[in-house]
């Protein structure tokens, strides 16, 4: 428990100390008007209470990541605790805060527009397509799971297909309606349920005091079959430490923030909160695996077992609410982000419903096609999920490099994003070579290639920086 408690304290201290440090590097201007006022349109640009913006941002970026990702990552042992803490503080929170604040400074621009400003027009065009594809993947991935669970909880005639249709109808409403109509009203409630569930598990961890591994015991790889910690664990935990998906969600809330001084609690604070939730679930899952073995691969079963055992019937209800609501809410904001990215690209105003429908209908048709594939092919869903996970972390790589270029141009300490950018470049490059859905190469060779690619990218960066310094 000592390692767990120290990790928990480190996350909290990280928010107040490192968060303040990053805020100073960015240089907030509390007197500067935010896009919520300068571009107010009653649909996407709406000033909202800070507590509500925080809760929406937290739920937007969380989804099932800090629960399912942490549970899968816990199989790797104590190393998962360290990555959640170090990743959340020095990579994820910095990534989320700076991308959110740059969107705030640039009138709530979507992520591809921000990346284009600093990596060039070619990257912008590529990222427009890449990000929209990722958003549609997110929306598709986060429909099947909740629909299947709802089908099990309801009468037989209400099958998975029925619930997929219901979820998509909700998606359409949430994507089209002004941000304060559905998202602004129900998201804070779902976020509160997710937090309450995590707090309940945290309390029971201290009450039950289960035997958790300590860092002093070493960090053996406990994953069945000994899948390599690098890079597999760093992709598996995903949202619990760093996620490119977060940078696509931050512009949604950048359009609703009342003052730049609230950026740290909303962007940096949401990621730290997610890290805390991930750490709690990693600890609980470690206890579960200690008692039940490593055979269980369904994270939903682990959640159900832990909550019912520790929180009783009420905990089981909360678990169902979290497992159903979290992915659905991530899915609808993914489609909303996709709509805004396409709208920014086509310069289509979004005040009229017809203009919103013009973008939404093709996006939903693609998502439905992916869902049909995932339902017909027994491995379809797993394949979509694995490509989503890699795409998600790859997006974080592009975002971190764009942020690094911004800091260099602004004559600010760029090392705070350069180190995470290099590390995640190595992770994603190695993963695509070693993963079965990639090239399936031997791990040692994959790592050599991954690190070689990272060195080449660093060399390009240093050459560019030298030219920039001489201008």
Question: What would you call each of these model-derived segments?
Answer:
Residues 139-165, 174-175, 194-221, 406-414, ...:
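Hydrophobic alpha-helical segments and their helix-loop junctions in multi-pass secondary transporters
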Residues 48-65, 204-210, 218-279, 321-330:
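Hydrophobic, membrane-embedded alpha-helices of multi-pass small-molecule transporters
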Residues 1-19, 73-103, 112, 446-455:
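Extracellular loop-to-transmembrane helix junctions
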Residues 10-67, 232, 259-262:
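Membrane-interface "cap" regions at the ends of multi-pass membrane proteins
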């Amino acid at each position: 428990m000592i390692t767990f408690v120290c990790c928990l304290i480190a996350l909290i201290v990280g928010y107040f100390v490192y968060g303040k440090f990053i805020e100073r590097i960015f240089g907030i201007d509390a007197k500067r008007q935010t896009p919520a006022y300068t571009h107010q349109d009653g649909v996407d640009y709406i000033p909202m209470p800070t507590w509500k913006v925080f809760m929406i941002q937290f739920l937007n970026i969380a989804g099932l990541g800090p629960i399912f990702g942490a549970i899968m990552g816990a199989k790797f042992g104590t190393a998962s605790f360290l990555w959640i803490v170090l990743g959340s503080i020095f990579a994820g929170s910095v990534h989320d805060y700076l991308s959110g604040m740059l969107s705030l400074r640039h009138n709530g621009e979507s992520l591809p527009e921000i990346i284009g400003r600093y990596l060039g027009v070619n990257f912008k065009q590529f990222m427009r397509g890449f990000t929209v594809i990722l958003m549609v993947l997110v929306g598709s991935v986060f429909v099947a799971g909740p629909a299947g669970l709802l089908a099990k909880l309801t009468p037989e005639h209400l099958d998975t297909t029925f619930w997929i249709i219901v979820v998509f109808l909700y998606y359409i409403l949430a994507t089209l309606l002004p941000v304060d109509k559905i998202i602004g009203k129900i998201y804070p409630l779902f976020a509160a349920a997710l937090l309450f569930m995590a707090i309940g598990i945290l309390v029971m961890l201290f009450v039950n005091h289960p035997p958790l591994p300590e860092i002093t015991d070493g960090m053996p790889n406990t994953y069945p079959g000994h899948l390599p910690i690098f890079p597999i664990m760093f992709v598996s935990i995903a949202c619990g430490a760093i996620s490119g998906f977060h940078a696509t969600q931050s512009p949604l809330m950048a359009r609703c923030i009342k003052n730049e001084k609230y950026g740290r609690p909303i962007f940096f604070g949401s990621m730290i909160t997610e890290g805390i939730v991930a750490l709690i679930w990693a600890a609980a899952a470690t206890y579960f695996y200690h008692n039940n073995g490593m055979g269980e691969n369904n994270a939903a079963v682990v959640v159900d077992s832990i909550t019912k055992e520790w929180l009783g019937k009420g905990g089981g209800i909360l678990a169902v609410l979290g497992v159903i609501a979290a992915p659905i809410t991530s899915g609808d904001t993914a489609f909303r982000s996709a709509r805004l990215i396409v709208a920014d690209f086509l310069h289509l105003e979004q005040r009229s419903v017809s203009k919103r429908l013009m973008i939404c209908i093709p996006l939903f048709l693609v998502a439905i096609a992916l869902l049909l594939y995932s339902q017909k092919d027994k491995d379809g869903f797993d394949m979509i999920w694995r490509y989503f996970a890699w795409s998600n972390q790859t997006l974080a790589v592009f975002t971190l490099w764009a942020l690094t270029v911004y800091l260099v141009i602004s004559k600010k300490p760029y090392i705070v994003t350069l180190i995470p950018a290099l590390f995640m470049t190595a992770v994603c490059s190695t993963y695509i070579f070693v993963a079965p859905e990639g090239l399936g190469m031997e791990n040692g060779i994959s790592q050599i290639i991954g690190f070689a690619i990272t060195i080449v990218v660093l060399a390009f960066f240093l050459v560019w920086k030298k030219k920039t310094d001489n201008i």
